[in-house]
A protein has these predicted regions:
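Sec-dependent signal peptide recognition
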Residues: 2-10
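Hydrophobic h-region of N-terminal signal peptides that target proteins for export
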Residues: 10-18
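Phosphate-group recognition and catalysis centered on beta-loop-alpha active-site segments
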Residues: 19-271
């Protein structure tokens, strides 16, 4: 997320839809993280600091990834290994050999590793799910859980009420989530016609929609069919040119790696 929208670029992006006015919900992918030109994290991804920065810049919410330690503790990390995002806690040295999360107990994880950051104050332990949700609640923004860990849904519902987003694949799993939550559900897809995806969403019920990284799926006709039927359409970390095209084609959610200029931009307004 080291690419920053200038105000001008952001305005060009937001007015690309002609003839209508609508809101697009903007979420920060793994929080609002950033890197130096040399590639070292400034604000670490999937960190409490990245949640706070997303709130400061006005995102409606953040997306985060939930995985389990060896002893079953839910923590926020995208990769199977710690190597890309963490360093040794003792001397801040890089991890030379692969360090797999599944091989570490929660105590080992918190004791031996910190998130990479050029700012020593942000070299914090990899956060738990509860720590991220607590910060979202404190900052007043919505967590989007990209998770296959069932217990994470239950914790989110307990801590956030219905003010969270369940984002994963599997219609049957989402049907079970709907039994205890009225949260927004975004079903991860890779294929299917608009009609096929509408049928999937009907079987889930409530406020729900689809999300994909396959930007070629999101033609104007495809997006219109979904939104006319009352469903959400999320563009998930598209390349910049395809993000602009998707906004023009009618998406309702934007999950992005690009940094918005500071300010209360809870939603992109198109017209």
């Amino acid at each position: 997320m080291n690419k920053i929208f200038t105000t001008l670029t952001f305005i060009i992006l937001t007015i690309s839809v002609a003839g209508q006015s609508r809101d697009i919900h903007v979420f920060a992918h793994r929080g609002c993280w950033s890197k130096t030109e040399a590639g070292e994290f400034i604000i670490p991804e999937n960190s409490v600091a990245a949640v706070a920065e997303a709130a400061r810049r006005g995102y409606e919410g953040i997306e985060c990834d939930v995985h389990l330690t060896k002893d079953g503790k839910m923590v926020i990390l995208h990769d199977r290994t710690l190597n890309r995002t963490a360093r040794k806690a003792g001397d801040y040295s890089k991890l030379q050999e692969p360090v797999y999360l599944k091989d570490l107990t929660f105590e080992e994880l918190r004791r031996d590793y910190v998130l990479e950051s050029e700012d020593p104050k942000l070299r914090t332990p990899i956060p738990t799910l509860e720590e991220i949700l607590t910060e979202c609640r404190r900052q007043g923004i919505i967590p989007m859980l990209h998770s296959a860990v069932w217990a994470s849904y239950e914790v989110a519902q307990e801590m956030m009420g219905d003010d969270w987003i369940c984002f994963t694949k599997g219609v049957e799993k989402m049907q079970k989530v709907r039994q205890f939550s009225d949260c927004t559900i975004l079903l991860a897809i890779n294929d299917g016609t608009a009609e096929e995806n509408i049928a999937r969403l009907k079987s889930i019920g409530g406020n729900c929609g689809i999300s994909t990284m396959k930007y070629r799926l999101y033609t104007a006709d495809f997006c219109k069919a979904l939104t006319d039927a009352g469903y959400e359409v999320q563009a998930s970390i598209f390349p910049f040119a395809e993000e602009k095209l998707a906004i023009g084609n009618g998406i309702t959610y934007l999950l992005t790696d690009r940094i918005l200029p500071s300010g209360k931009w809870k939603k992109i307004k198109t017209r």
